[in-house]
């Protein structure tokens, strides 16, 4: 499979194994060791080279599974915006699941076909980052995170995240 095909699979299926592999490939390409530390260092260097502020970001893996990871919603929204505006990053945007159509957004309560985004769910965190077009035709990048979700509360948090994203889809500056 091509890297593009693997990226599509990793995003749609939310494959932690593939994202770890991509981290190792980035490490090798940037002259780092293909280890957790090398991958996370290389990924942060790569993101910073795009002009995105990575200060305060802590990565201990590239799958997003580590509870020690710390990443801001702003950083994720900036990456989503860049993927929509930079042709070199467009494959990342295209690989994201589409609401109501595929992957981790297939059965979310989000307006079908209107959102491309990546989900993130851990024990006490629910997040969604991507792009949508508002009712008045503006393309917007977003990232929303619910942190400190009570045990057993991920489903309810996800419903609130979906409701917030739907408010972006239906937003119109004209009222």
Role assignments for model-derived ranges:
Residues 55-175:
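C-terminal soluble interaction/assembly domains
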Residues 1-90:
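A small/polar active-site loop signature that marks catalytic segments
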């Amino acid at each position: 499979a091509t890297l593009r095909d693997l990226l599509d699979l990793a995003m749609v299926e939310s494959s932690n194994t593939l994202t770890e592999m991509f981290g190792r490939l980035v490490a090798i390409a940037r002259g780092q060791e293909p280890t957790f530390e090398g991958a996370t260092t290389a990924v942060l260097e790569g993101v910073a080279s795009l002009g995105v502020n990575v200060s305060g970001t802590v990565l201990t893996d590239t799958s997003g599974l580590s509870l020690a990871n710390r990443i801001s919603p702003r950083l994720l929204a900036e990456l989503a915006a860049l993927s929509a505006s930079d042709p070199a990053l467009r494959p990342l945007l295209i690989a994201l699941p589409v609401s109501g159509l595929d992957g981790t957004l297939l059965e979310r309560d989000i307006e079908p076909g209107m959102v491309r985004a990546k989900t993130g769910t851990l024990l006490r965190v629910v997040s969604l980052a991507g792009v949508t077009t508002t009712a008045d035709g503006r393309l917007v990048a977003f990232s929303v995170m619910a942190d400190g979700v009570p045990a057993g509360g991920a489903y309810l948090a996800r419903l609130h995240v979906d409701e917030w994203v739907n408010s972006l889809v239906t937003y119109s500056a004209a009222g």
